[in-house]
Amino acid sequence: MFLQGKRILFFSAHLFGYQNDIRLAMESVGAIVDYYDERPANNFLVKGVIRINRNLLAGYINHYYNKIIKETLQKEYDYVFFIKGESISACNVRRLKQFHPEANFIIYHWDSIANNSNAQNLLPYFDRVFSFDKIDCERLGLHFLPLFYTPDYANIPYYDKEIKYDMLFVGTTHSDRYKLVKRIEEQIIKMGGLCLTWFYFPSKILYYKMKIQNSYLRQIPVHTFHFKPMSKELLLQLYAGSRIIIDVQHPKQTGLTMRCIETLGAKRKLITTNYYITEYDFYNPDNILVVDRNLPYVPEKFLNEPYRDTPKEIYESYSIKNWLSSIFY
């Protein structure tokens, strides 16, 4: 086990349970993990303010990290590992390094740098910086590493008779995502397909902010959206009963979303707006349809043809264990 006996101080925001998946995966290969939320709280107000202007909570964030530093002061770590680093300041990273000089500091960005105003402030303080976004890696000299799927997705069965939905979308509402998904849904319904869409906002502050900025969303009733994340159990059930998954990435983002990699893991077909997916080794036009963001079109042939298996060595290279081995090499 490549992390046998290694001590890791791990920071990640609560994000649909992925922080637990990563912690459990590290422990499964021998690591001893101390986990802390990267944000000082997870209520909608704190999440919303951090996204809009984290400096408004600087005192609160500093107090939170002071407490963590005191709690971990007497411990020795091999690694201090951050996911994204949305709320922590450069000053607090420096202080962690001061008290844990023996540790390797690693950060992984699973969002575009353009979507995280705090990201570039932190880069100089980490020994290794990874990103899922190829363009960010080329521009800033970061290590490129796509996201991962967990065993939960790899273990989803596929039985034709149990497929209920031809198209499934579950995701956060941003940019033009709602409008695009609905345009794709309309086409599939016209072809006789059954669709399920589920749109999420992390907080009502972000919902009202986006509603002010987006004239299209102002026409959509508030009850259309969800303000609590879908449980992982329900999401896995929906994947098991779906033929095609929809992905609409943020316009400022070139990296493949978690949804893309999970769809690979679940062996489902994918419709995406991210044309960069054609550069990845698992791309197969029989399984993955890239649509124009301005004029999405779904051929009936793609809807009806079966999924084609990905070569085993390529498929397994996107597992969470392989992702960890790339980070902690």
Which residues does each PLM region occupy?
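Active-site proximal beta-strand in glycosyltransferases
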Residues: 97-112, 130
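An amphipathic, basic-hydrophobic alpha-helix
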Residues: 57-76
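N-terminal Rossmann-like NAD(P) cofactor-binding module of classical short-chain dehydrogenase/reductase
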Residues: 81
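Nucleotide-sugar donor-binding catalytic core of glycosyltransferases
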Residues: 2-59, 84-91, 117-257, 269-278, ...
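Surface-exposed amphipathic alpha-helices with a cationic face
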Residues: 93-100, 185
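Short amphipathic alpha-helix with an adjacent loop that forms part of the alpha/beta core around
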Residues: 68-73, 156-158, 298-304
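Pol beta-like nucleotidyltransferase catalytic core
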Residues: 265, 269-329
